């Protein structure tokens, strides 16, 4: 299906930089933190990742939208990125799985987007000055002054608890495994065929994380972010998972307190992304806001224990501060881009976490064995509990 683009759009950063381009989504105005992602593929997974809440995503790869969109390559029930910035939208979306071109997909989800701007220049600005607020305005009556005022009024993500905004309203079971080339997404796995009972805190969970847990025999119950530890422990889980999510981890007092209560037991804990940061905070460490964060599918990470390198998918603007880690936490992984902390393991509890995204979507599968380590801890816990 050919895409027809006729409307204008503009992007204004809080430092006053203005880009003019073509509207590729809904009309209107969108304000958020502008970040850049270096992934070549997976734009639909990126858009539907709840971790991008209140963020406008710049995709550095020049051609975005080649394969259109479909109803399977999603990480949540809707689009969470509040805006999209790309260099070029191909006129034709071509894939045997394509159901809707990217522009129409953005319109259907009321997402404002802009194309035909110099994304290399924009990325350099974000690298040099750091992630900053921005405003995309699309449609008629474009107003640079109004857009700049809107960008400057954005409060920023530091101090912002977004997990409570994107979490589920009520608990639900998840028993669906990973997508397959033959058959697509499978039907739910029967509960009796799943060996391990895992409770997953939803701080903005990606569905592929849940799929990979099911692939390893986990009967997953997803619970709201503010679920007390007492309710989780009353379910007698074999393990507790702490999900990814958006925003600053430090304001999430409810999550930190719940994790601290669970840590008093010997229940295995596995955290990813925001869950990693929350585990660090619950253990006594601190977190910090990064200059422009890590967003991409090609980030090298050192596995300290094994002495090898993993290529990983990353999406975070905050990080656990290694200098503040208590004595009972050992560092397991570090970024080879900037040396930032990527993984931790408690020495006195069966709890560990990883800053990147071992479930990928998009990205490589080098870090997928972290899910297997979670299962190993669960097996050990079950044996000791007998």
UniProtKB/Swiss-Prot annotation:
It catalyses: hydrogencarbonate + L-glutamine + 2 ATP + H2O = carbamoyl phosphate + L-glutamate + 2 ADP + phosphate + 2 H(+). GO terms for biological process: 'de novo' pyrimidine nucleobase biosynthetic process; 'de novo' UMP biosynthetic process; glutamine metabolic process; L-arginine biosynthetic process. Pathway: Amino-acid biosynthesis; L-arginine biosynthesis; carbamoyl phosphate from bicarbonate: step 1/1; Pyrimidine metabolism; UMP biosynthesis via de novo pathway; (S)-dihydroorotate from bicarbonate: step 1/3. L-glutamine binds at residues 51, 245, 247, 274, 277, 315, 317-318. Its EC number is 6.3.5.5. InterPro entries: Anth_synth/Amidotransfase, CarbamoylP_synth_ssu, CarbamoylP_synth_ssu_N, CarbP_synth_ssu_N_sf, Class_I_gatase-like, CPSase_GATase1, GATASE. Residues 197-384 form the Glutamine amidotransferase type-1 domain. It comes from the Bacteria. GO terms for molecular function: ATP binding; carbamoyl-phosphate synthase (glutamine-hydrolyzing) activity; glutaminase activity. It holds the Pfam family CPSase_sm_chain. GO terms for cellular component: carbamoyl-phosphate synthase complex; cytoplasm. Keywords: Amino-acid biosynthesis, Arginine biosynthesis, ATP-binding, Glutamine amidotransferase, Ligase, Nucleotide-binding, Pyrimidine biosynthesis. The keyword Cell wall biogenesis/degradation does not apply. Gene3D superfamilies: 3.40.50.880, Carbamoyl-phosphate synthase small subunit, N-terminal domain. The keyword Nuclease does not apply. The active site is at residues 273, 357, 359. Residues 1-196 are annotated as: CPSase. Signal peptide: none annotated. Composed of two chains; the small (or glutamine) chain promotes the hydrolysis of glutamine to ammonia, which is used by the large (or ammonia) chain to synthesize carbamoyl phosphate. Tetramer of heterodimers (alpha,beta)4. Small subunit of the glutamine-dependent carbamoyl phosphate synthetase (CPSase). CPSase catalyzes the formation of carbamoyl phosphate from the ammonia moiety of glutamine, carbonate, and phosphate donated by ATP, constituting the first step of 2 biosynthetic pathways, one leading to arginine and/or urea and the other to pyrimidine nucleotides. The small subunit (glutamine amidotransferase) binds and cleaves glutamine to supply the large subunit with the substrate ammonia. Belongs to the CarA family. This is Carbamoyl phosphate synthase small chain. The gene is carA.
